[in-house]
Regions:
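Short, basic/aromatic recognition patches
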Residues: 20-44, 80-84, 96-102
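Regulatory sensory and allosteric helical modules in signal-transduction proteins
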Residues: 54-61, 73-98
Length: 289
């Protein structure tokens, strides 16, 4: 890391910020686990919390399930694209469980809170959690997304601090145990508000420029480290293949899983071209997964 590239920070502050954002997402994770109403979140850890730049790039993730890491960032970016930066305000909270945005199933509900400092958008706090019920049928007999349950398009749960009570009513009317759903909703809000509060403490202590440049340095260093490790792998094409017995609907019909990894220099391409086509059962995944 050179001072010319990051004049507002230095290696010491950057390392403090790196550990600081890890601590923030760790506290978000702990608060969610302590306040969630269903065991899928606090026992199975079917959730993820994170901090993201104002462009939606990942700053830090408090991992529950690693499979959400990319989906979280893509979900934040989708919400930014949907509303536009100029239509995102202090007090807003955005929500969706759209499977084609999150890359997952409808039970995974994602809340995103924009973080402002002195009137300027500087980051986002986000929480994806598995609700025990979102309506719909049992997964083992579901063959289309409409059977899975309530679909929540990208929208604002809160607009400039005003909660969308109609949306809450819609959720209550479409789940079997409303108290559980609303309890998990409140737990997720607690998590993202914790992220906002703690991240702003770092910003106020070191200044927004130092925080922004430290985060850029952390990302650059992370990319450099990953590329260095990739260089240690001999150039070539590596392939692996497995299968699932079936998709739960077409019994006995194998579902092939094939992956090809191409390494060239410090770059790696993961090719899923030969993986199975979409199946009738509930094993399909979106690109963000």
């Amino acid at each position: 890391m050179g001072n010319a590239a990051y004049p507002a920070t230095n290696p010491v502050i950057t390392e403090i910020v790196r550990n600081g954002v890890i601590a923030v997402t760790g506290e978000m994770k702990s608060n969610l686990m302590r306040t969630a109403y269903n065991t899928i979140i606090y026992e199975a850890l079917d959730f993820t919390v994170g901090l993201f730049t104002r462009d939606g790039a990942t700053i830090s993730i408090g991992i529950g399930l690693p499979m959400f890491i990319r989906g979280m960032s893509e979900t934040v970016k989708a919400k930014i694209a949907h509303f536009g930066i100029d239509n995102i305000h202090p007090g807003d909270i955005m929500v969706t469980n759209d499977a084609y945005t999150t890359g997952s199933h409808l039970n995974h509900v994602t809340f995103t809170l924009p973080i402002f400092h002195d009137g300027e958008l500087i980051a986002f706090a986000c929480c994806m959690g598995h609700w025990i019920d979102i309506g719909g049928r049992l997964g083992s007999v579901t063959t289309d997304i409409f059977s899975e349950g309530l679909q929540i398009p990208i929208c604002k749960y809160a607009d400039k601090g005003v909660v969308n009570e109609f949306l809450e009513d819609v959720i209550r009317m479409n789940v079997r145990i409303p108290s559980r759903a609303m309890g998990d909703l409140r737990a997720q809000l607690t998590a993202i508000k914790t992220g906002e509060r703690r991240f702003l403490e770092l910003v106020r202590r070191y200044g927004p420029d130092a925080i922004e440049q430290s985060i850029s340095a952390i990302m650059d260093n992370g990319e450099a480290a990953a590329r260095k490790r990739t260089l240690a792998i001999p150039d070539g094409t590596y392939e692996a293949e497995s299968f699932m017995d079936d998709d739960g609907i077409d019994i006995g019909k194998r579902v092939p899983i094939k992956v090809r990894v191409i390494v060239k220099g410090d770059a790696m391409t993961i090719d899923l071209t030969d993986i199975s086509d979409q199946v009738r059962g509930f094993y399909n995944s979106g690109i963000t997964t």
